From Swiss-Prot:
Species, as recorded: Felis catus (Cat)
Site residues, Important for receptor turnover: 221
Keywords, in A-Z order: Cell membrane, Disulfide bond, Glycoprotein, IgG-binding protein, Immunity, Membrane, Receptor, Repeat, Signal, Transmembrane, Transmembrane helix
Domain named Ig-like C2-type: residues: 32-105, 120-189
Name assigned to this protein: Low affinity immunoglobulin gamma Fc region receptor III-A
């Protein structure tokens, strides 16, 4: 089958396969990294992905509807409840990103974390965020209703190496002025170590190497085929011309 394809055609196939391997998903990145914010908080969403030379525009979606905004970042200066929902983006050289959920809450305190599902051994960071960054004192973090950490001044709570026992419902409490305020409870899940997937053993560079090796083998095979045919044609011509000399053993 390979001999039916010209080198140009094979190179086109290799190029197409390489481009397909190169086409990756864009990614929405939140700054700050919290996906739960309070009303009036500022949020910047950035679209990370491959951009064509000279074109850094991006397409944005909010809850499935196109946002009339083409910049690589999308800013929400003062979040409102209607800003909640799923956000997606796409660059000129990438597939559409997976959706990222943004939740806009009302209240005095809000528990924040970079994510809510962790692997065993991960560091868990919890933040007791106040509306308009008002001063909070005597902050306490709770897991399943039990106090886990207390700070006289508002500070983040870190769990260095998460285990399954750290899964549960968390909230924070603190004093704003002379009022004792509490955040809503949020569930945190700690999963076991991830199982290696097949894709782990077939990284992106492996796919490119596969196409290159295939092309190289084709070139070698084609060269041998041409050389053998040329030698056979030469031998047949010499035989017809009577130039072949037979040697007999002693």
């Amino acid at each position: 089958m390979w001999r039916l394809l010209s080198p140009t055609a094979l190179l086109l196939l290799v190029s197409a396969g390489t481009r397909a391997a190169d086409l990756s998903k864009a990614m929405v990145v939140l700054e700050p990294e919290w996906n739960r914010v309070l009303v009036s908080d500022g949020v910047i969403l950035k679209c990370e992905g491959a951009y064509p030379p000279g074109d850094n525009s991006a397409q944005w979606w909010h809850n499935g509807s196109v946002i009339p905004h083409r910049a690589p970042s999308y800013s929400i200066e003062a979040a409102r409840s209607e800003d909640s929902g799923e956000y997606k983006c796409q660059t000129g050289l990438s597939e559409a990103s997976d959706p990222v959920q943004l939740e806009v809450h009302t209240g005095w305190l809000l528990l924040q974390a970079p994510r809510w599902v962790f692997q065993e051994g991960d560091t868990i960071q919890l933040r007791c965020h106040s509306w308009k960054n008002k001063t909070v004192q005597k902050v306490q973090y709770f897991q399943d209703g039990r106090g886990k950490m207390f700070f006289h001044k508002n500070s983040d709570f870190y769990i260095p190496k998460a285990t399954s026992k750290h899964s549960g419902s968390y909230f924070c409490r603190g004093l704003i002025g002379n009022k004792n305020e509490s955040s809503e409870a949020v569930n945190i899940t700690v999963q076991g170590p991830p199982v290696p997937s097949t894709s782990t053993f077939l990284p992106h560079w492996y796919q490119i190497a596969f196409f290159l090796v295939t092309a190289l083998l084709f070139v070698v095979d084609t060269g041998l085929h041409v050389a053998v045919q040329r030698d056979l044609q030469s031998s047949v011509k010499e035989w017809k011309d009577g130039k072949v000399t037979w040697s007999h053993g002693p």
